């Protein structure tokens, strides 16, 4: 009788019929960092700034689809990578940077695409107003052979160029770094850079990693070699971090050099991590990064301040194709260099923090994606494929979740499943961000339409008072996708037990979990309505219910 009463109350209370909540903000608790999140759907020219309930604060438009990352600058303008066609056609292609003011007016642009070079994936806006542009540069098969490449072919090594913007378009190049200046090869002593990669761990083995397509990033005729997908600048250290996906490594280089110095030994890698096999100091078993994206230094005030964090995509990871968020502390010395002992690889040997604690198939994006540390100690995660954005605490509990409703064919309404709604990366900015000063932050309705689910904003960042308030109400619970076909992810802000009933009150599944989310196989369930009841483990929390729909 108790279960039937619970079921009937749930069916009456929930606002939708057979369709459930499929897009927009699925979860927003008081433990999430309250701020404004950039959502930049990859297949469109639109960029939206939303609050934690998915309500739109501002929108910028462009004639170009997303070409990778975008950022808010401290004057309230949006800096965005744009996709343009050209001689280079690999995954993550950009080619143009645009800067638009708060009112969506173009105030500066840079075209960085010709037959010799092409911007891609990312850029970094520096405190001095300059911009670091990540780009491919062309090397012919003849140049590859002269550098010692076995089976030489067209290659696109990476370059980073610092540009001082001028006027409304373009700027002056003030610094450059080229990966091609820092090679090593062990195949021909008569060619430059001869030596064993293991003896030159600060250089890049010209014969490591495949080039081109064949299932990887880029087209069949691509010269994409390193496939860097992120660049991050640390002004305190005056160092640059680079994510090189094809090498499964993070590199750090010194920015405190002249361009001439950067072309010599001073421009060699200061540090590298993720795959010791890339420099002959390990094998496949030592690899810890698997097609990673994004890299950021964690800022001061965060529990892991000073460490590095990446989205470790996990394609080809032993055991499962599963993503993780990995944080580690590079062995930096007082002079800004990094410890390297004997013939050992760069450390460390253990993570400072990782999410989830055990990789699970329910969390996976084979490409794109990123992570941003939050001021309250949480991490904002972009699971790029499928446009899923969510926030987790230090304990691994999910406290905010959002599904991008906008894809290549427009915005879907609530209750419908989005298509091609990928998001390259996302960033959140707190209420005190300088770019918001004097701006109209009045929200309009969410992209997907009116919020009938009753999302509430939680502006207080006092986690103690937030927890106290949360004890007065049922915990927010969510299910995705809903309707579901074969697999269903259930999420709650704390551990507990899930009970799922069919419309006759029969118990279908019981699942006790210590994590924020759990994956349920529903492939064999008959089509129809179900009710999930979540009973929190913590005393004082009442149970909560959620309507589910199964439709094969």
Spans of model-derived segments:
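Sec-dependent N-terminal signal peptides
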Residues: 4-14
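Solvent-exposed, flexible loop/coil residues
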Residues: 5, 277, 433, 437, ...
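C-terminal outer-membrane/trafficking sorting elements
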Residues: 7, 470-552
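Sec/Tat signal peptide C-region and signal peptidase I cleavage site
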Residues: 14-20
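Histidine-/acidic-rich catalytic cores in large beta-rich domains
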Residues: 20-464
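Low-complexity, Pro/Thr/Ser/Gly/Ala-rich linker/spacer regions in secreted
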Residues: 459-475
């Amino acid at each position: 009788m108790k279960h039937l009463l619970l079921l009937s109350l749930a069916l009456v209370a929930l606002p939708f019929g057979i369709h459930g909540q499929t897009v927009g903000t699925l979860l927003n608790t008081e433990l999430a960092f309250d701020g404004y999140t950039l959502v930049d759907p990859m297949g469109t020219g639109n960029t939206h700034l939303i609050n934690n309930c998915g309500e739109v604060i501002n929108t910028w438009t462009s004639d170009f689809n997303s070409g990778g990352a975008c950022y808010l600058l401290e004057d309230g303008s949006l800096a965005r990578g744009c996709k343009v066609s050209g001689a280079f056609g690999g995954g993550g292609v950009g080619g143009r940077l645009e800067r638009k003011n708060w009112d969506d007016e173009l105030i500066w642009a840079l075209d960085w695409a010709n037959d010799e070079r092409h911007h891609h994936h990312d850029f970094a806006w520096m405190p001095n107003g300059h911009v670091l542009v990540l780009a491919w540069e062309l090397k012919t098969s003849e140049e590859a052979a002269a550098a010692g490449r076995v089976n030489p072919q067209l290659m696109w090594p990476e370059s980073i160029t610092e540009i001082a913007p001028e006027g409304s378009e373009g700027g002056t190049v003030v610094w450059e770094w080229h990966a091609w200046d820092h090679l090593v090869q062990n195949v021909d002593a008569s060619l430059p850079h001869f030596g064993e990669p293991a003896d030159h761990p600060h250089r890049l083995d010209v014969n490591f990693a495949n080039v081109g397509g064949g299932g990887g990033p880029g087209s069949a005729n691509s010269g994409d070699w390193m496939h860097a997908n992120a660049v991050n600048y640390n002004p305190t250290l005056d160092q640059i971090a680079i994510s090189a996906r094809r090498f499964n490594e993070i590199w750090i280089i010194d920015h405190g050099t002249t361009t001439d110095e950067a072309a010599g030994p001073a421009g060699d890698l200061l540090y590298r991590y993720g795959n010791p096999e890339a420099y002959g100091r390990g094998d496949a078993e030592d690899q810890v990064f698997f097609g990673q994206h994004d890299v950021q230094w964690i800022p001061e005030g965060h529990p892991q301040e000073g460490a590095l964090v990446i989205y470790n995509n996990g394609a080809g990871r032993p055991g499962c194709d599963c993503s993780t968020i990995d944080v580690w502390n590079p062995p930096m010395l007082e002079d800004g260099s990094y410890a390297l002992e004997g013939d050992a690889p760069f450390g460390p040997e253990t993570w400072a923090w990782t999410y989830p604690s055990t990789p699970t198939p329910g969390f996976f994006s084979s490409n794109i994606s990123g992570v941003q540390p939050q001021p309250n100690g949480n991490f904002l995660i972009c699971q790029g494929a499928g446009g899923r954005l969510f926030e987790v605490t230090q304990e691994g509990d999910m406290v905010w979740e959002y599904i991008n409703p906008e894809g290549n064919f427009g915005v879907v309404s609530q209750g419908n499943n989005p298509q091609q709604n990928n998001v390259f990366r996302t960033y959140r900015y707190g209420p005190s961000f300088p770019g918001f000063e004097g701006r109209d932050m009045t929200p309009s309705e969410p992209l997907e339409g009116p919020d009938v689910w009753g999302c509430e904003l939680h502006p207080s960042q006092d986690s103690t008072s937030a927890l106290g308030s949360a004890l007065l109400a049922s915990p927010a619970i969510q299910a995705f996708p809903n309707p579901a076909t074969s697999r269903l992810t259930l999420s709650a802000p704390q551990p507990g037990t899930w009970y799922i009933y069919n419309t006759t009150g029969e118990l279908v599944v019981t699942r006790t979990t210590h994590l924020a989310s759990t994956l349920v196989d529903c492939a064999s369930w008959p089509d129809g309505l179900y009710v999930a009841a979540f009973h929190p483990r913590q005393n004082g929390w009442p149970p909560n219910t959620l309507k589910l729909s199964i439709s094969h």
